[in-house]
Each structure stands twice: as structure tokens, then as C-alpha cells.
Amino acid sequence: VYGTLGDTGVFSELSPYAPNSPYSASKAGADFLVRSCFHTYGMNVVITNCSNNFGPKQHDEKLIPTIIRKALAGEPVPIYGQGTNVRDWLYVVDHCSAIERVFKSGRSGDTYVIGTRNEQKNIDLAYLICDVLDAQSPKSDGGSYRDYISFVTDRPGHDFRYALDPTKIETELDWHPQYLFEDALANTVEWYRKMYQFS
């Protein structure tokens, strides 16, 4: 909902909304609707804005499942542009714990940004996933899954960088992620590898 960042800076609860796609505009619109119900009717609401989620059971067409699925199938792994777009990745289990904390303890009418300060370029993320696959399910020819990475034309409206400052939820609600990114990513790769029936 906040739009895109350049090479520096972070989004916080004080950042203005600046959605750049119909998808993000619909999310911003939902936030405005909820906020208006609080101000008009006193409805007990809280709003959360999160960084990119990952973990088991995510839709197959999302970035991380796509990288895993394509690599295991020996197909080209598509990476938009040069892979320099940056995302702050949030493990789904940590996201759920944050939502629960906000639901139980957040101030009515307030917004809480949920992130982990874990920025990754898409290409670096793809390399990490391929390295995990190399360790968990080595290729029979001894090669690396990195060999399947293929750069494709960037998609329209692709925001360059997202980075969130979770200071408010950390200080006011004492929430912190419980999983290290590398461990959560390895767990995620293993889950998809088993789901796709690659041992």
C-alpha cells in the first residue's frame, strides 16, 4: 500500500499510502474503509501492513514456490529483470504470531507494520533456495540448481524495493520474529520438496 522505495529508507506507520497497482490500491482501499468505520462508528479495529510472506502452503505461483517447483522439475527458473528488486521476507508463522499479538493487545484504531528487517534481492533469494535444494536434494549429475535461473522481462508496475520498520510493534507490543530466515527458508523448501514428491 505504501508504494515503492529507492535504495534506502523504510516504510513505517507514518508513511503515506501510494499504491502503484490495482492490487495494492484494493488493499489500501480496504484499509481506508476499516479506518473510516473506526472514526465514524467507533468500531474496534486494528490494521496491519506486512512485508512479503513465505512458508508452507503458499500459492504455487508465488515467487518462492515457483523457484522451488521449477528448479526441481529441471525447468528455467524465471527471475524478473536482473533480479535486483528487493523484498523484506516474513515467515508465515511469525506473521500469524504478530497478528495475534495485535489482535489481543493492539490499540483500537491503530496501524501496525509487521516486518523482519530481512531484505533480500530476488536473485540472492533464488541463489539461496537453489543452495538449499543442492543440500537437501542433490542433482544426479552433480550440478547446481542455480543453473536453471533464467532472467525474464520485468513485469509492469513491479515495485523496486519494500522495506518495513517494525519498531512500533516491537516496542509497544513486544513482538519479535521467532524464526531465523535461513531456518524458515530451509523448512519451506523441505515442505515443498515433499509436496512435489521430490526426495
Task: Name what the model sees in each region.
Residues 1-47, 54, 58-60:
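Catalytic helix-loop patch of NAD(P)-dependent Rossmann-fold dehydrogenases
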Residues 52-53, 85:
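A short, flexible beta-alpha/helix-coil linker loop
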Residues 53, 61-62, 145-146:
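Short secondary-structure boundary micro-motifs
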Residues 65, 71-199:
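C-terminal substrate-binding subdomain of Rossmann-fold SDR/epimerase-dehydratase oxidoreductases
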